[in-house]
Amino acid sequence: MSGTRASNDRPPGAGGVKRGRLQQEAAATGSRVTVVLGAQWGDEGKGKVVDLLATDADIISRCQGGNNAGHTVVVDGKEYDFHLLPSGIINTKAVSFIGNGVVIHLPGLFEEAEKNEKKGLKDWEKRLIISDRAHLVFDFHQAVDGLQEVQRQAQEGKNIGTTKKGIGPTYSSKAARTGLRICDLLSDFDEFSSRFKNLAHQHQSMFPTLEIDIEGQLKRLKGFAERIRPMVRDGVYFMYEALHGPPKKILVEGANAALLDIDFGTYPFVTSSNCTVGGVCTGLGIPPQNIGDVYGVVKAYTTRVGIGAFPTEQINEIGGLLQTRGHEWGVTTGRKRRCGWLDLMILRYAHMVNGFTALALTKLDILDVLGEVKVGVSYKLNGKRIPYFPANQEMLQKVEVEYETLPGWKADTTGARRWEDLPPQAQNYIRFVENHVGVAVKWVGVGKSRESMIQLF
């Protein structure tokens, strides 16, 4: 019956497709992405969890941040460092996608790729797709990042401790609507050059000591434009096709972490993007119903780079031991990380914002030598227990942490490959975390390699 329809097929005036509710929902939703996010102040071992999940992923994407993130992945004894490239680029069967929420320093991107090529990374350009809406980080953004830190030091006697990669200044340009994007670089270059010059002059008027080789930078950018042109796609259409075409496994690799989020982190000592789950939707251009599992990555203790409140910090032998045993210095900056006990107030707060479906607890083996292990379970302010994580930094500096002391296991866990291999006290520690946060631990990390991530379910 082409072109005609029985009148009782549908109510008068109804158009479109008639389906049952469940089919409608499935058709409308499409595939769901799996998200890996940091649940503390970064450096939790997200790269390792991504690496595990990336082995059978079809697409691995980054949705925010820039080359201020640092992910280390060890494969076949080789250590790869990723900052801007999704760490899933190692997987030769998958496509890596840099979303619109990421800010891209092109010289940094190629430098990073070349460094990893020397370690054995091959054909990455054929597997990388870049959103045309991603903003560009220019060399002068990086210079300004350094100048702003000097200013803060002079004015307030303290700085934020940025990575000086130009991330904050680029997101500032984006919010001020003066930034330039990949799509601008790839269209009319004269128009791009004129906007680039305006942006450079604006920064020079704010920072009189700032020197910018405008012509030199434009020449380099023109060269980079041709190199990246084959990799650039409209990110919205790319993600839509990926979600609604043949079923695909899509993995999103969060950079930074919950407590560094521009809205929910320990402001102002945060990064300039949303590194909580909302940043996935805005940074890739996908709706909330396409978010599937959200895995929170947590270190078995707490670390923080740079300044800012850190309630469970241990400036003592314990802190020193955690730093030495855990090799706690930054991948991007080489700075020493401050160390302290696991803080469950932070973890519960990160769960409220992100809605974790499961946790990965990493670096459990670092606690192997301790006779007892403390865990921060609540905060007191002026002698009264407070049921929330304070937004105000001065208040957070003043909180007194209430600890629970658990027995240590004093045994080497690095050889453990199953739950049963872990000492009862280590199992008890993991169950304690689960019960207090209300989220199951899916993986436990006891070493550097892929094999040392014990999967519990």
From Swiss-Prot:
Alphabetical keyword list: Cytoplasm, Disease variant, GTP-binding, Ligase, Magnesium, Metal-binding, Nucleotide-binding, Purine biosynthesis
Residues that, per the record, bind GTP: 42-48, 70-72, 337, 363-365, 445-448
Catalytic residues as annotated in Swiss-Prot or TrEMBL: 43, 71
Main location, first listed in the record: cytoplasm
Superkingdom of the source species: Eukaryota
Renumbered residue ranges of the record's region Disordered: 1-21
Residues annotated for substrate binding in this entry: 43, 331-337
Pathway stated in the Swiss-Prot or TrEMBL entry: Purine metabolism; AMP biosynthesis via de novo pathway; AMP from IMP: step 1/2
Disease cited in the entry: Myopathy, distal, 5: A form of distal myopathy, a group of muscular disorders characterized by progressive muscular weakness and muscle atrophy beginning in the hands, the legs or the feet. MPD5 is an autosomal recessive form, predominantly affecting the lower limbs.
Function: Component of the purine nucleotide cycle (PNC), which interconverts IMP and AMP to regulate the nucleotide levels in various tissues, and which contributes to glycolysis and ammoniagenesis. Catalyzes the first committed step in the biosynthesis of AMP from IMP.
Protein name according to UniProt: Adenylosuccinate synthetase isozyme 1
